[in-house]
Amino acid sequence: MAALFDVKDVTFDYDGIPALRGLSLEVGAGEGIALVGANGSGKSTLLRLLDALCFPSNGTISFCGQRLTPGLFERNGFAFSFRRSVALVFQNPDVQLFNSTVFDEVAFGPLQLRWAREQVTAKVEQTLELMGIAHLRDRAPYRLSGGEKKRVALASVVVLEPDVLLLDEPTSTLDPRSQSQLIDLIQGWKGASAKTVLTATHQLELLEDIADKVVVLEEGRVAASGTPAEILSNHELLLRANLVHAHKHKHGTLTHSHPHFHSHSHGEHEH
């Protein structure tokens, strides 16, 4: 599998505070990768770097063999091609919703990429139906619920049919039905559509549904990578990375412990 992204020894600082520390990672075309880690482990920062919204303090990130630099994006041809191929959905949908209606929000990206107006209208209508938000087409995004905003943000990316989807906590704020629909979409993207999908998530119970490979981040570094089954069975790793906690039970004079998943979006524990 050819390397689509090649991340080499990347460091990134926020005002002198390190967010990533010597992180290296290869992403193959068509891979479905889940990024997991506690808050502050570097998941969102890595996705922003892969989307070239910022650039490494040290180290390099290459896309299709070209090193991503500010200068490269000053070339309109490359910037246009990259933005057509790679798309990021932020954890907080308010960051990317700014148009007056849901329809205009989903149409914004295709229009910026100079699609024909007739093509834009047809594709937006199709995407609104796909994401279950056709009834919201004339609503103002800022008046929507958190889950509705998340679906609009996803639609604004899905409509572009990018080759690479970078999803930051995409299931947060979604109701169970919408979450299930999104998982089906992710499976389709990384299956028949052969898209590359990187998903940052806290929800370990979703890993086997959304990823072929799991990368565990800890303090801005790659702590481990493997299949979902390999990562989920490594309780010592999950405890150290603060993805589960040990829960003790006492039965008479006997005490035993077992791990609980941190299910942040539902506020529940899972065994």
Report the location of each language-model feature:
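Conserved ABC ATPase signature
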Residues: 140-144, 148
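Helix-to-loop junction immediately C-terminal to a conserved catalytic motif
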Residues: 51
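Conserved beta-strand-loop-alpha-helix hinge in the C-terminal portion
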Residues: 221-243
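H-loop/switch region of ABC-family ATPase nucleotide-binding domains
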Residues: 201-202
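Catalytic Walker B motif of ABC-type/P-loop ATPase nucleotide-binding domains
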Residues: 165-168
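Conserved ABC ATPase "signature" region
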Residues: 118-136
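Conserved ABC transporter NBD signature motif
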Residues: 59-71
